[in-house]
Amino acid sequence: MTIMLQIYCKNNNLTKDFPEGSTLLDIYNGFNLEMPYGPVSAKVNNKVEGLNFKVYYNKDIEFLDITNPSGMRTYFRSLCFILVKAVEELYPQGSISLEHPVSKGYYCTLHLDRSIGLDDVTRIKQKMQEIITDNIPFQRIECHTEQAVELFTQRGMMDKAKLLKTSGQLYTFYYRLGDTIDYYYGSLVPSTGYIKLFDIVKYYDGLLLRIPNRKNPQKLEELVKQEKMLEVFQEYHRWNQILGISTVGDFNIACNNGHATDLINVSEALQEKKIAHIADEITHRNQNGERVKLVLISGPSSSGKTTFSKRLSIQLMTNGLKPYPISLDDYFVNREDTPLDENGEHDFESLYALDLPFFEAQLKELLDGKEIELPRFNFTTGKRENSGKKLRIDENMILILEGIHALNPALTPNIPAANKYKIYVSALTTISLDNHNYIPTTDNRLLRRIIRDYRYRNYSAEATISRWESVRAGEDKWIFPYQEYADAMFNSALLFELAVLKDYAEPILRKVPNNCPAYSEAHRLLRFLAYFVSVQDNELPPTSLLREFLGGSSFRY
């Protein structure tokens, strides 16, 4: 007797019966859905699964295409596996590493015993297209973790063997594509034919893997030159290689061998050295006739701008200057006056969430030598208040303006460029899960924000996750276009950071109920954090950038 299951489809708000053991693809076809770009994965009771996932109980299902962030991740992972297989077939003695996002694509390093040329790129792209045309199925294989570790070790894929060996999981899964095996953090599409659009081009010394635009999947993401960003990533990759820590498996082994404190101390010292170098650059400009009046510090949400500005101020003071940090957040309009986005929700990332006329008037008064009273924004009440702090600047004083819009030319249009020093701060995660699974920098920042919002702003993880897509859209519009204008870029991510955030984030994420849309993201983040060993924060210095989110800072916020 066939057991029938009741399946509710969120895409069309219909319920239908299906045989037990039906795949998600069977269910999609059974509902006769017509998604413009086709499904690539689905949320099953708010957990993302691949389309070959079999259903054995009544479920709520929502099918996802590549316009959805989770769907795009599935598409991208599948494309990566195709790239890995193409390189394996073309260069049996070579390999490829997927390193980090840059220029609206993903930077890859092709490891050969020679430099790569345009003909290599052409061959790889042609081979990838052949693999896609052949519509080869992706096979998901579940096994005991020890078996997977042994298999990857035999294949010389030690990055994956180390990751799985230190993950603490009894069982794991890996994927097979023809004769090629690999491990991916998350689901893949059923077969290579699901990949419709991609490109791969030569980019400096490596390759750039390009993907469709999520809002318009019939077009590739526009290629944006980000030379400074690439330089920062590559510098930190070189530093990680010197330390022998390029992947999470390397990191976990080092911590298990008692080196966590060393990694904390070295990472913190490197950041302090970078901050001191930036302070020296500003001082050098002042000594060479360029009067820097404003240091503008921008960066996306939870990049650590505030603590960076305070630490930079200390370094400037050691150089004989008198910095005064001012947070642009204190110039927010009252919450009820915040502009609305296209969905009718408050757009806190908009430039016009700031009271620009008031800010410009106060800045002019300061630069004219007048005294002002600084405002303070109360995030609890959503109102701007008088702080009681008075400020007048003198010849040796530098204003440190920190906020997401600091690099936007519209913020300080009347200040000559020679009087401004611009700094872009972001958490550019340079460690990877393994050679084919990079860690999104947005995950790093989202975890910071979840912890900070919960501890200091009385927001649940559900609320923070629900707003994150809007935050990201605001960053794309208001922040990222100006990052290459910076005179200096500072990477606020710390090598050990995610292992420290883990113990703070996990209990907050577990509070997200499984019947809400944010649960799928909370579940994904919990699975991600499970790859890291825990590192306690007792060795963190009180001036650490992480203290801005965790507490225990010697700075006042």
Feature annotation, model-predicted:
Residues F53-M72, S95-K273, I278, T283-N288:
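Auxiliary tRNA-acceptor-end handling modules of aminoacyl-tRNA synthetases
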Residues F359-A418, W468-Y482:
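Glycine-rich phosphate-binding loop used to anchor ATP phosphates in small-molecule kinases
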Residues K305:
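Conserved lysine of the Walker
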Residues N286, P413-Y557:
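Conserved NTP phosphate-binding and transfer environment spanning the P-loop NTPase/kinase superfamily
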Residues V295-I297:
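Hydrophobic anchor at the beta1->P-loop junction of P-loop NTPases
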Residues F308, L312:
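Hydrophobic positions on the alpha1 helix immediately C-terminal to the Walker A/P-loop
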Residues T2-K104, D113-R114, Q126-K127, M229:
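Ubiquitin-like/PB1-type beta-grasp interaction modules and other compact soluble beta-rich domains
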